[in-house]
Amino acid sequence: MSRGAGALQRRTTTYLISLTLVKLESVPPPPPSPSAAAVGAPGARGSEPRDPGSPRGAEEPGKKRHERLFHRQDALWISTSSAGAGGAEPPALSPAPASPARPVSPAPGRRLSLWAAPPGPPLSGGLSPDSKPGGAPSSSRRPLLSSPSWGGPEPEGRTGGGVPGSSSPHPGTGSRRLKVAPPPPAPKPFKTVTTSGAKAGGGKGAGSRLSWPESEGKPRVKGSKSTAGTGASAVAAGGGGSAAVTTSGGVGAGAGARGKLSPRKGKSKTLDNSDLHPGPSAGSPPLTVPAIPVPATSVTAASTQPLGPAPPITLEPPAPGLKRGREGGRASTRDRKMLKFISGIFTKSTGGPPGPGPLPGPQGLSSSSGSRELLGAELRASPKAVVNSQEWTLSRSIPELRLGVLGDVRSGKSSLIHRFLTGSYQVLEKPESEQYKKEMLVDGQTHLVLIREEAGAPDAKFSGWADAVIFVFSLEDESSFQAVSHLHGQLISLRGEGRGGLALALVGTQDRISASSPRVVGDARARALCTDMKRCSYYETCATYGLNVDRVFQEVAQKVVTLRKQQQLLAACKSLPSSPSHSAASTPVAGQASNGGHTSDYSSSLPSSPNVGHRELRAEAAAVAGLSTPGSLHRAAKRRTSLFANRRGSDSEKRSLDSRGETTGSGRAIPIKQSFLLKRSGNSLNKEWKKKYVTLSSNGFLLYHPSINDYIHSTHGKEMDLLRTTVKVPGKRPPRAISAFGPSASINGLVKDMSTVQMGEGPEASTPMPSPSPSPSSLQLPTDQTSKHLLKPDRNLARALSTDCTPSGDLSPLSREPPPSPMVKKQRRKKLSTPSKTEGSAVQAEAKRKMWKLKSFGSLRNIYKAEENFEFLIVSSTGQTWHFEAASFEERDAWVQAIESQILASLQCCESSKVKLRTDSQSEAVAIQAIRNAKGNSTCVDCGAPNPTWASLNLGALICIECSGIHRNLGTHLSRVRSLDLDDWPRELTLVLTAIGNDTANRVWESDTRGRAKPTRDSSREERESWIRAKYEQLLFLAPLGTTEEPLGRQLWAAVEAQDVAAVLLLLAHARHGPLDTSVEDPQLRSPLHLAAELAHVVITQLLLWYGADVAARDAQGRTALFYARQAGSQLCADILLQHGCPGEGGSTATTPSAATTPSITATPSPRRRSSAASLGRVDTTIALV
């Protein structure tokens, strides 16, 4: 075996060197003919075929077994043995002159045949460089197909000869193909090619070059072309003729005339140059091709050219002998590597990714992997909408926006989504739920929008998943409009009212509106529903031509991003390190006391450090859960001087009290920070410090109460809006200010140990100064650093030096004096002012300060007491100040930081004019466009000028700029003029103008002109003014009332009850002639305003108030219209009534469930502000002024 291995290695080297110079050819045994007999070949004794049933390993004695140089299922057999008993030594590999090509005419009855090399004696002929086509080699050699399979033109001189039935094992780039072409002289249209899975000569068949191992198959996919699958034998079909192909363990295709399958012309791509030899296909023996067995479910076929019509392909299970032939014919690793190297010389793989491809053509066969390729190609060609993608489960680096779409089947939501995703319109009514995704750019950042279209009602999973929900209905379908209201109710019931962060949008689709199906849902009804849904925007879209489609999704995504930022800001405010509210949030309110209700003093309610006691607070909160009597807290009045000095309470008492204070206040705004502080007003005459329970709420308000009991019961409390305030610390520079004198050696401006402060420069500056004890008999106070800096002429510099600067020796002539006390003492009760210029020196100022301290504290002992002052101020925009003092500077800094955070949050929630213009420009444009779209609003109501830009609110009409000046002269009781472009348009004003319009207004105010000519756009101002005054002031053209004799009050009640806006406007116009008797025979003595508020009709409510309805009118139970508006759940009606000075609801609202659940408007200010002007101008009776 070792000698055979040496011969193998040597033969390999020789073969590689002569690879480019030698052309190897295999010639099948020719039919018995005189011409064939003349061309003999040595080794004819080995030409007898072996018995097909004889095993491969059963070799005759004296014959050495052949060893293969290469094996790749179709490798060429090369003898590596020396001459034995039955064989001759193969000749050396030397080039031979090519003989002229000669056509071969096989016998009609003979069929083209290919068989593997038998294990007989070695070939005596060896590897001939150029065997003649008509030669008769020994039958012990395995003939190879030499028919050209590349489809290109054949080389010159090779058109007539060749080996019968030869074919290239490399028909295409990355694929394997067997092609049987008819001979050029007389092709036959139909032939039968039969392939078997094993060698005919034995049960352990050798490998064939027409089938490659699975691990080495490298098919490619390029464009519409596909390549052969792994382990599959493909037979390509040409353009003319066809053939039935039967394969075992592979898939074949019909074969016909030769087609162009490769761009490489005249070049050999096989080991033996057999692809350059044409061969006949008629009368040839059957082809026997060993193939790798593959499952029937994973059969693939490939072709580099579309196939013509062909009969169906028959798949057969692999023969048993094929598997044994594969297993017995495996080559070594070295042989396989060598074969890969040789194959790479003649074939050049494409750059496509490896993978099986589907079979093109009419056969339509594809494997599971081929189906995946087809699916992948279809998805790549489709738009960005992908259904059931893994994007719903995998994490991404870009943020997500989860958007849900709800609506009826006929709402048009599927067409809306399809238009947004693809940009094209398609009538879709999907009865099942779908999922989509698309990338969007929001605030300059890419977001992945996950769209979930729900076919039915939302469930709990959907309500928790969605960041925004779009409710879609069709403007021509009443049922879809009603379904939206039910869907919204179900969503709110699942998600809850209190859970914020959900952006809502209501969309009315115009896709189905036509002459046969007109619009049935008016704009006023849709906007009223949008108002009831709260924090909802209304849009009208048309997916047919894309009106507002992209805008809906863009604005909803923008709203989601804005809400997320606000939630993050609030979460940051709530997670302040100094607020212990989250540590004891689960403690019940009922169990709040401290050892029978006794507390020592103020110091017992404050932790000594904001970082201590969070873990212990949770344990102590459980300890006090069973105690009661919350009203007994702080009953005893304590001396102010002992609040911070005497700490008689234990740590457990302090923590339990602190935990109680943090858990109170259920049912109101979320408290961010709360504790006891000292408070005094800076503007009142009473300068005495009082202990208050101070609470900082998440809505931007600071509340303080005399006791915790008052806070629990919401009595005797004051609050201030932090939007209009700022917080300051006395003697401390503003944040971000950089000191010009270097870093401070003190802690928050207070030097703890003077012995460690460097009092000068140079070598002696590093020596600690001694600290002599204070002398009680002397009135000379210690020259502390605060007093020295405050005595400087520049007050700002003094403030900076007192807090942020390290004192140096040259700042003051007194700076080098040794301090008599180791502790620096700050003033506590009175702010020091800058000394006047008339004062002689700083010593006089110091003497005054000492005398004031002596008078205030009563003794010199208290002057040198180590007592610290931790004060901060809240200053309003009106100049009012509130002084608060904490127990430590850590607590003070925590309060200052929390208040600054809330001020920032309030300012960010409050929209300035520019921000409002940018964010609300599109929504305002929609409102203005809706006003312009009202009937008759394209021209001026008085002169007919086109495109009016001004409006009269109480008339409900649009006017031009020339007529607007005349309307202003009439007075606001007749005409309230507003610009469409320059003024803001609240929701209620937009509803009024869209509900009336110029057409309705002229039918009321200009019904009978009495032959008078109406002015035109070219009329003079005098003509316009005369017409306008006659029309609105003198009521000359007013439409008459009906023939009914009912009082105007009853007619107005009936019109309000019928919600007839035009009739209400006409009756209100006639009521100007005299007082309007609104008394009706109503058992509850309600007025039309009560009825309008009960019906939640915003337009009629606004018109009644403009035309003089009594906003303070009460019914039999003493309830005003505000009660009915809140009972109906109409926030807009309630806002309108409050703007016109409507008093409280009146009566008892506890018996009305809807009124009890309706949020109060005046009790707790809303944390969200629509505009800065509205926030600064609001009036609240609970705001503290002192």
Curated annotation (Swiss-Prot):
Present in cortex, hippocampus and olfactory bulb but absent in cerebellum (at protein level). Residues 47-62, 324-338, 648-661 have a biased composition (Basic and acidic residues). GAP activity is stimulated by phosphatidylinositol 4,5-bisphosphate (PIP2) and, to a lesser extent, by phosphatidylinositol 3,4,5-trisphosphate (PIP3). Phosphatidic acid potentiates PIP2 stimulation. Residues 24-371, 576-613, 628-666, 759-784, 800-844, 1145-1174 are annotated as: Disordered. GO terms for cellular component: cytoplasm; cytosol; dendrite; endosome; external side of plasma membrane; Flemming body; glutamatergic synapse; membrane. Belongs to the centaurin gamma-like family. Interacts with EPB41L1, PLCG1, NF2, HOMER1 and HOMER2. This is Arf-GAP with GTPase, ANK repeat and PH domain-containing protein 2. It comes from Rattus norvegicus.
